[in-house]
Amino acid sequence: MDSRTKGKTVMEVGGDGVAVITLINPPVNSLSFDVLYNLKSNYEEALSRNDVKAIVITGAKGRFSGGFDISGFGEMQKGNVKEPKAGYISIDIITDLLEAARKPSVAAIDGLALGGGLELAMACHARISAPAAQLGLPELQLGVIPGFGGTQRLPRLVGLTKALEMILTSKPVKAEEGHSLGLIDAVVPPAELVTTARRWALDIVGRRKPWVSSVSKTDKLPPLGEAREILTFAKAQTLKRAPNMKHPLMCLDAIEVGIVSGPRAGLEKEAEVASQVVKLDTTKGLIHVFFSQRGTAKVPGVTDRGLVPRKIKKVAIIGGGLMGSGIATALILSNYPVILKEVNEKFLEAGIGRVKANLQSRVRKGSMSQEKFEKTMSLLKGSLDYESFRDVDMVIEAVIENISLKQQIFADLEKYCPQHCILASNTSTIDLNKIGERTKSQDRIVGAHFFSPAHIMPLLEIVRTNHTSAQVIVDLLDVGKKIKKTPVVVGNCTGFAVNRMFFPYTQAAMFLVECGADPYLIDRAISKFGMPMGPFRLCDLVGFGVAIATATQFIENFSERTYKSMIIPLMQEDKRAGEATRKGFYLYDDKRKAKPDPELKKYIEKARSISGVKLDPKLANLSEKDIIEMTFFPVVNEACRVFAEGIAVKAADLDIAGIMGMGFPPYRGGIMFWADSIGSKYIYSRLDEWSKAYGEFFKPCAFLAERGSKGVLLSAPVKQASSRL
């Protein structure tokens, strides 16, 4: 169902003379065009009826509204829905019809009032809320701005500073805080919500409660000079934090116009900006990510078979290192009882200590109470053998990347675990078929690849072999959802989706450095592009041991298209291992602050002499644009291989995997979306040119060559891919 035929409102007039309008658009009563137009007609009817004294707006099934139906943007871009004139909804309907009405309205808020939902509530003359309701304007994280008057009403209700905090961080507040801020007029139990709202509306009519038009309020606004200072500071901070995104600054402009020139001018500016931001590339990228993230759990041939997830009552984890302890933390935080197995008491104590430290950091930050900490820790039990595995529903192996060790573990697990138990490996690079070679029940072997730190990073790669049952995938998708991860189901290959796509990223950077490029300029250019850090800073962070082990797997499996640099092995010989030893590509002080190391030059020169690479003046003086293209186009090339081989069913899954696993900037939409925004023809021509000049590493794969020569979208579905899912 698209936004043209989605949702409705229902109006009921009681004997007390209050018309209750209910928003109905499951699951969160989003404000589709249909809902908004229905609301308009209900309002017009209520205003024209003599038996209606006041109006209450509420949402069906315990939720007020989750905001504007974002699919409406997509429908407008496709031309399926005519875009309303700028300000039609925010000014003509919400301000001039609803807020300026001669009959008062009260919002009865339960569950959530987010985005357009909160904006609608703020236009009412009072707001009554249930205690658990969440109130916020999260639009900026979706690439748009509050477009239903939120830029004008929120500062007038809660003050400019708090409004900026809520809008710029996209973080909601609970009803009690909303009440203390002045956003909510009263907090009542859910059962009394509509009754209280009706009474409040009649009290406004009887002048026992104030009739407040929030857009006209000025008592919470600071003096003009102070407001300008606050906004100037907010703009500087925003530019520093998100230099590649225009929409937050455009949002601040709308707020400023309203404060300087009055609310009407502010609403007009907001309407103008709202219609402009939907055309920005960053907005298109963020909206693509929003929908793609929700689509990763839909796997053709798996989730469309009516399979019901089995209940996972207990999980065992083998290995209490950084990864194993992180996975254990994620599970117990979501109320899963966990057994953590180690080889000796010392390692077990250390593993449990890591889990404890992960939770204690939450207590220190105030996001977890001491009581909750103790209750959560009680879900974790330690073990030195497999005896306690006899009643577990899932085991996740998280030991070092050693094939024979993993094979032995999986063979042992089969002897102790029940028949239904899922046998999962957290390997990041090793072929799952090899890991399960000595195991008879291949249908329950699956990859559960978390990213470090596992209790924080949002991605879970679910890796399916040719034998893994659909039921196991459905079970793991359910676990992923419950532990608040975004699961992406991929096929089995070296490196799976994320590590495989991105192995050329670091190798391309190493190649450029050996040819004369400055590593620090490369890191700067890539950080400026939007990555959390550049490839050299990343190598230091993960440590050279991990970097070498990972690179070795790819060099062994894809020798024809890898670049083997000796820079890291040479540094490792000199006891440099990255940030942990305070020496890597950078030098680190006591606070782990990085600074360039003049000694790096000697390792680069030595590596260059070993590889036989000659200094190339052209590559030594690359522009930022060239650096981005030469490091990321090989990633696009490998992503095309992954897609063509059926390792991923949808290009959008690769977009989400890259964003959540490697920190690819979300506002660029993901690696495949970004590639399509540049054009397959251009990417193909550049890679082809570099492969002729610098070798096989840059050679476009057949999939990219075919699509690039015709200018076809790289993300278009693969019609006859032999899917590995």
UniProtKB/Swiss-Prot annotation:
The answer on whether this UniProt entry bears the keyword Iron-sulfur reads no
Expressing tissues: Highly expressed in senescing leaves and at lower levels in flowers and siliques.
What Enzyme Commission number(s) appear in the record? Answer: 4.2.1.17, 5.1.2.3, 5.3.3.8, 1.1.1.35
Motif Microbody targeting signal boundaries: 723-725
Localization per Swiss-Prot or TrEMBL? Glyoxysome; Peroxisome
Pathway(s) served: Lipid metabolism; fatty acid beta-oxidation
**InterPro entries attached to this UniProt entry:** 3-OHacyl-CoA_DH_CS, 3-OHacyl-CoA_DH_NAD-bd, 3HC_DH_C, 6-PGluconate_DH-like_C_sf, ClpP/crotonase-like_dom_sf, Enoyl-CoA_hyd/isom_CS, Enoyl-CoA_hydra/iso, NAD(P)-bd_dom_sf
Q: Which GO terms describe its molecular function?
A: 3-hydroxyacyl-CoA dehydratase activity; 3-hydroxyacyl-CoA dehydrogenase activity; 3-hydroxybutyryl-CoA epimerase activity; delta(3)-delta(2)-enoyl-CoA isomerase activity; NAD+ binding
> Active site at which residues?
119, 139
Domain description: The epimerase and isomerase activities are contained in the N-terminal region while the dehydrogenase activity is in the C-terminal region.
Function per UniProt? Involved in peroxisomal fatty acid beta-oxidation during seed germination. Possesses enoyl-CoA hydratase activity against long chain substrates (C14-C18) and 3-hydroxyacyl-CoA dehydrogenase activity against chains of variable sizes (C6-C18). Possesses 3-hydroxy-3-phenylpropionyl-CoA dehydrogenase activity and is involved in the peroxisomal beta-oxidation pathway for the biosynthesis of benzoic acid (BA). Required for the accumulation in seeds of substituted hydroxybenzoylated choline esters, which are BA-containing secondary metabolites.
Protein's name in the database: Peroxisomal fatty acid beta-oxidation multifunctional protein MFP2
Encoded by which gene? MFP2
